[in-house]
Structure formats: C-alpha cells, structure tokens
Design a protein with these regions (language model features):
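Short glycine/proline-centered loop/turn elements that form peptide/ligand docking sites
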Residues: 33-37
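Extracellular glycoside hydrolase catalytic/binding regions
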Residues: 24-27, 39-60, 64-170
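Active-site-adjacent substrate/metal-binding segments within catalytic domains
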Residues: 1-20
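Substrate-binding cleft of carbohydrate-active enzyme catalytic domains
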Residues: 18-32
Length: 170
C-alpha cells in the first residue's frame, strides 16, 4: 500500500487484526494516517481497501487523518495543487473527500466514513450551512451509505477558535 508496494506480511497482519476485532462485534477505524490532501497513492489505497473491507460493518473508513494547507473547495472537490518542498515546486492532482466517498459508494460499500476538518482536522466551519454562500457549505453528500462522521482534533495551542462551539452551531 506504500509507494506501489503491497507489503504482503503487513497486509496480512492488518487483515488479521481487523478480522479478530470485527468478529467479536467491535469496530475498527481503518485510518489512512496521512495528512495534507488525498493524493493518487492514497486514492489507490482506498480503492484497494474498499475491495477488501467494503461492507464489513465493523470497519469504519478514516479518509485522511489531518488535512491541512488546502481550502474547503480543494478538501471537498479536489483539483490541482501546487506544493513546494526541498526539491522545488510541483503540481499534483489531489482528490476531494467527495470524490473518494463517491468512489467508495460506487463500489457498493456502505461503511461509515470519517472526514477530518481543515488545519490538521481542527476547523470545520466550512461544513456550516451558508458557508461561502453555499446552502449546505462543503458538507459531503452520502446518498447510499451509512453516513459520514466529521472528526475534529482539538489542539490546546489554538485557543482562538473553539471547534466544539462550531460543531453545535453547524
């Protein structure tokens, strides 16, 4: 699942853990513990994970751990994103949460999906009705599945904003 490699032993271990937990009637969050935005590699991960774990009611899909340095439009709908690292600038296609959710649902999987807000899953003001003039903000549309859980990571070093208050407001 990483850099085009399948890591067979690792995947067997993940399968074993998921099967052991879900066979006991418990839940597992399959968390793509990545951040920034959903790349081609991460899209491929979800494509494969849905084939293996789709419709296992005990598996919850955590789409992207901590999105950051993107706006709500990119978060929801994807697009071309320019980034800079030690090698210079590059532009890459990133996938929006709605695109990945649609891919999962189009494969018939109804698993609950977790979507973190922006700025390391801290903010989710973009999900409020009326945000940016949009009737329902950037909320994800899940017409055929078991729903979306919105995830916030409340960090104490960001006192200027209270996501709990915003959650109640939205």
């Amino acid at each position: 699942w990483y850099q085009g490699k399948s890591y067979g032993d690792y995947r067997k271990m993940v399968d074993n853990v998921i099967n052991q937990i879900t066979s006991r009637g418990k839940y597992v969050i399959l968390n793509l513990h990545e951040f920034y935005a959903i790349t081609e590699q991460q899209k491929d991960f979800w494509n494969d994970a849905v084939e293996v774990y789709g419709n296992n009611p005990g598996v919850i899909f955590g789409l992207l751990n901590e999105p950051h340095d993107i706006d709500w439009e990119m978060w929801r709908n994807g697009g071309m994103l320019e980034t800079t690292d030690s090698y210079g600038k590059k532009t890459q296609r990133v996938y929006g949460h709605q695109e990945i959710l649609d891919m999962i649902r189009n494969k018939g999987a109804k698993n609950i999906v977790i979507a973190g807000g922006l700025d390391w899953s801290y903010y989710f003001d973009g999900l409020c009705d009326g945000y940016n003039g949009m009737e329902h903000g950037y909320k994800l549309e899940d017409k055929t599945g078991n729903g979306v859980i919105y995830d916030t990571h409340i960090y104490p070093m960001k006192p200027e904003y209270n996501p709990v208050e915003k959650a109640v407001e939205c």
